[in-house]
Amino acid sequence: ARFPGKRAGILATRGTLSAGIYQQALDAQGAHWTVPDSEAQDALMEVIYDGVKAGQAPASYRSRFLSVLERMPQADYFILGCTELPLAVQALELDIPAVDPTEEIARTAIRFCGYPTLPRP
């Protein structure tokens, strides 16, 4: 575990949050988690759809993304539960404690196929 005993901030689309995928998995492990409040979720949806997916310059969504993180002070680390969010973090050159589920799935699939995985960047 990379963040034992820490509270996860789940960042994802409304649909993913409504499905409860990450919440259920964390609950099964007895882990604590939080999600954005309504205003922060609105801002996150704008970052995802009007920013990253729309191909906008990172500077155009920087303040919105940072406002989401700032509104989640109880989160010790973030689960980047939408494929656009790791791209945003990288483009904005943010150094935040985070888990990229897509990267974790890829690493697991590679190991499952019998290949060693490379160290984390």
Q: Could you say what each language-model-derived stretch is?
A:
Residues 1-121:
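Non-catalytic structural scaffold of enzyme domains
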